């Protein structure tokens, strides 16, 4: 009998077909708990995307499980210690969506700093020239980008910023000597207070570990420049939504802006304090959604198969 794998990720046809040639696959919606629980008992492998929680409760229902494949980067929904206790390997795709997220961050940045109204039909001269007078953006090579979390994505964001001509300041858990040994472009390592106080644009790239919940709240936001642009394409739980709403409301007149691709929870609750603020833009977690990134994330199935064959996977979380 071939191994049995449950898939809850949006695999491309190529990835799905590749897996189906090797194992028995059941494709399921991650929200269909009843169906999943009925299948866990015979599952040898599990492929997940963003939202399914892999914890002791799930693992206790899956005594045959050998491997969890995360089609993506973040592992905050996977309890790695629980997986170790149950002897379940965890594989993922840490490099798959970096380019997509970096491109998206700069798309958000340019949308916010370089406004560009659309001409969608006939327009009179007064409106046309009014736009030319009033729509004045900020030039990136005159700005300082602060990156908090200088990992794979943060570094690539920094590389693009430097290529454009932005000053780059960063804060990370790793020591400066190690960062400089791994990065070949100019940057300044600063403490968090200095980063907040000097950033024209603050781009957040920390991971979803528990210690990062509400990493940025009232105290941190109060240190920002009043015209700072805050971009979060990392994890929604990093930013205290209530604190951000207060900061945004206080900086409407001074040019403060926030653009969020991630929220806590997703989708946002009906009473989300960020709704209705003119200088806050919310997006539905799209940073990694390119055809290339989705394909590359889906190829986690290769490492799932490797573990099931008793081979060493390419990218293992433990």
Describe the predicted segments one by one.
Residues 1-91, 217:
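An N-terminal-biased, well-structured beta-alpha scaffold segment characteristic
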Residues 2, 65, 141-144, 227:
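Phosphate-coordination loops involved in phosphoryl transfer and adenosine-cofactor binding
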Residues 54-57, 173-273:
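Rossmann-like adenosine-cofactor binding region
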Residues 86-88, 94-144, 159:
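Phosphate-binding beta-alpha-beta segment of Rossmann-like dinucleotide-binding domains, i.e.
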Residues 150-151:
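Glycine-rich Rossmann-fold phosphate-binding loop(s) that bind the pyrophosphate
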Residues 154-155:
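N-terminal Rossmann-fold NAD(P) dinucleotide-binding loop
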Residues 268-269, 277-297, 303:
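Adenosine-phosphate binding glycine-rich loop
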Residues 295-318:
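NAD(P)-dependent dehydrogenase/reductase Rossmann-like domain
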């Amino acid at each position: 009998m071939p191994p049995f794998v449950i898939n809850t990720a949006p695999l491309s046809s190529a990835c799905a077909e590749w897996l189906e040639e090797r194992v028995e696959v059941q494709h399921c919606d991650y929200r269909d708990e009843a169906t999943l629980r009925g299948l866990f008992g015979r599952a040898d492998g599990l492929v997940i995307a963003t939202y399914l929680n892999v914890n002791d409760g799930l693992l206790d229902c899956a005594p045959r499980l050998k491997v969890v494949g995360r089609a993506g980067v973040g592992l905050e929904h996977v309890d790695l210690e629980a997986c170790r206790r149950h002897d379940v390997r965890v594989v993922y795709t840490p490099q798959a969506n970096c380019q997509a997220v970096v491109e998206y961050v700069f798309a958000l940045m340019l949308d916010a700093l370089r406004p560009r109204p659309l001409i969608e039909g006939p327009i009179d001269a007064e409106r046309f020239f009014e736009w030319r007078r009033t729509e004045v953006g900020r030039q990136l090579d005159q700005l300082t980008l602060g990156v908090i979390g200088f990992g794979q994505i943060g570094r690539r964001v920094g590389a693009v910023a430097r290529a454009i001509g932005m000053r780059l300041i960063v804060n990370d858990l790793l020591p400066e000597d190690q960062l400089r040994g791994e990065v070949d472009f100019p940057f300044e390592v600063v403490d968090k207070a200095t980063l907040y106080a000097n950033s024209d644009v603050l781009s957040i790239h920390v991971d979803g570990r528990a210690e990062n919940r509400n990493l940025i709240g009232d105290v941190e936001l109060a240190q920002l420049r009043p015209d700072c642009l805050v971009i979060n394409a990392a994890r929604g739980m990093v930013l205290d939504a209530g604190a951000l709403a207060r900061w945004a409301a206080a900086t409407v007149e001074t040019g403060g802006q926030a653009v969020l691709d991630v929220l806590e929870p997703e989708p946002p609750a009906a009473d989300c304090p960020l709704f209705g603020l003119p200088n806050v833009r919310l997006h539905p977690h799209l940073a990694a959604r390119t055809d290339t990134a989705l394909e590359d994330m889906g190829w986690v199935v290769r490492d799932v198969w490797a573990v099931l064959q008793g081979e060493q996977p390419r990218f293992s979380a433990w």
